[in-house]
Amino acid sequence: MASSIIYEDKICTVYKTGVVKYALLEFLSEYTLNYRKPVEIHWSKSDTGGHAVVACSTRRIGVDIEQMKPRRYEAISRRYFNEVTDDKETFYNLWCQKEAYTKWKKDKIAHNLKADIDRRLIPLEGLPNDVVGYICY
């Protein structure tokens, strides 16, 4: 079971830390009410442009969100991806998927930019129009 909580972050890292703690407490309270055995908890967080997301699960999980900004999409994708694109949305979808996958693997992004993703990726809903996000598990 996985859950995610999305909050606008208008203050600073202290607030983001509070969001992580709140998400973990909410997730744990659900399990402590229903189970008496210890539960292994996995969590992942991401923030961009004043927004933060936290994902909690009983299995490995990775999450990433990115605010879409103007960049040299074709040059970056040619250098780092197997797929070449000059489209902003396609670029950010690929980047976000690879970041979420990297967090799931607990690895470095440089090792996974050209990797084929063999895990389930789900797009996050409810984000602002200029923000894209994925959860990997």
Task: Say what each PLM segment does.
Residues M1-Y137:
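Core catalytic alpha/beta fold that binds nucleotide/phospho-ligands
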